[in-house]
Amino acid sequence: MRNVKAKCRPKDEKAVFLPYQQKWCDDRSRIKLVEKSRQIGFSWATSNDLVAQAIRTDAKYDFWVSSRDEIQARLFLQDCKKFADGYEKFIKAQSGVNVYTDEGGKPYTSFDIKFYNGIAIHSMTSNADAQAGKRGTRVLDEFALHPDPLKLYSIAYPGITWGGQMAIISTHRGSQNFFNKLCEEAKFNGNPKKISLHKVTLENALDQGFLFKLQNALPANDPRQDMDETDYFNDVKSKCADRESFLQEYMCEPMDDASWFLSPDILEDCFYRYGEAWQTPIDECTGSLYIGVDIGRTHDLTVIWVLEKLSGILF
């Protein structure tokens, strides 16, 4: 370990996980949820936990990972593979047993990892309907950023009927998002779903050794090497777009949607999903076409866009 400037250090400096990560991984409640700061290692720690569960001899069902888009889910699976490689190396050296399945060919793809006991970890599309018909533990990563969190929860929950747990991981995305409604229900309305609720702000993470871990991972010439926890906290805060975004992204305080001229739900309905076709060839247009131009005179880009008028609406 380096001689770093961080003052808050974990009790066991060589431990892989910080206390809040370990507490999350040790929680075997049927439904657990964490409202968290950005980039404090929850998805990474959860990927190790999935592998540790999947390679057990008594594992019964597969594990399903859904994130806000397919790319993010595959990145989660890449972390799973790194941990699985570590388990494979250690266990094989100790007992000669393979962790991965031994069927010839690669035991993993971009979408799944297969283990010796027939259990697999799968990455999934963000489409909530993909949750149907699948049994076992599911991780709903970046939950509030999914296209439809309410639908995702509704279809994912029945999948743990025969065993496993549902782990919901997210930063907030507005006070009216279903993620925040789950948090408020658990805190203030009797917790009817019996959710095991975790909350870790940036301040909480720093108190438990986050900066110590970060500085040991950063290059020696990174300017954050000269910071203590107070310096780092203030640096992050000062670089956020505004106070409200800092509170939401790092302090688990959702933005008040009532202050938005257009609500996040309305804006999200206007987004094209990843992989969704959005361009129409000009020769296939049947309505009148309108062109708009916004000229960037100094540092901004010039933008040109074409819209088609159908039934009185421009698309």
Sequence positions of predicted segments:
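Metal-dependent catalytic core segments for phosphate chemistry
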Residues: 286, 295-315
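Phosphate/NTP-binding elements of NTP-utilizing enzymes
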Residues: 1-293
